[in-house]
Amino acid sequence: MQVISSKDNELIKHIRKLKEKKERDASNEYLVEGIKIVKEAIQENAKIKQIILCDDCEKTESIPKDLMYEIAKHICIYVTSKLFKYISEVQEPQGVLAVIEKNNGDKTIDYTQDIIVALDDVQDPGNLGTILRTVDSVGVNQILVSKGTADSYNPKVVRSTMGAIFRVKIIECEDLKKTLKEIKKHKFKIVVSSLQTENTIYDINYYKKVIIIGNEANGVEQQIQEMADEKIKIPMLRKNRKLKCICS
């Protein structure tokens, strides 16, 4: 078994760079780290390019044997414990991470869904991860994100999705307003989050609706608000009015 020990190895350099959006965009790849999320990536048939393992994981049996059996079906790269800590994003690494191809090739919107969720410049990676996780939990399998929204493949977002990133199709919109106009042609109504209404998420019918979640500080862009058919208040996260989610 060959074990990489040098920081100058080209793969190691690439993995380190994948922490940056520029490299993720250029390579169309991102990282997932940890036993649970790597297991989910395998179970959900994510496009795994390589799995990176700490060279002592087999000796310590830190990774379950049944998972090691599945991991072995992929391209596996072993690195020293010291080097794994160097490439890891967490303080206490579990000795396994994977390089995965982004699931962003298909930009087609599924109009058979009753609900489409769209994000208008949501900035906080933790909020974005929570929204993806919530959307997944209620059976919505696609989400639209504006150009100004946080990167869906940011390591913090990926961790906070708890595997939802493998199941929810993320459609990046160059021009969200233009996309919404197209969706309206399919008889969907636009619902925006707003403080200027008494209606809540429990007061509307969710058949053929596009739910727009706005920026944490500024809300939904004015031009998109003007396109809205309905407005609703949404639950807030803590007292700083950060958006949590609106699907329940």
Predicted regions located by residue number:
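Post-transcriptional modification and biogenesis factors for structured RNAs
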Residues: 1-247
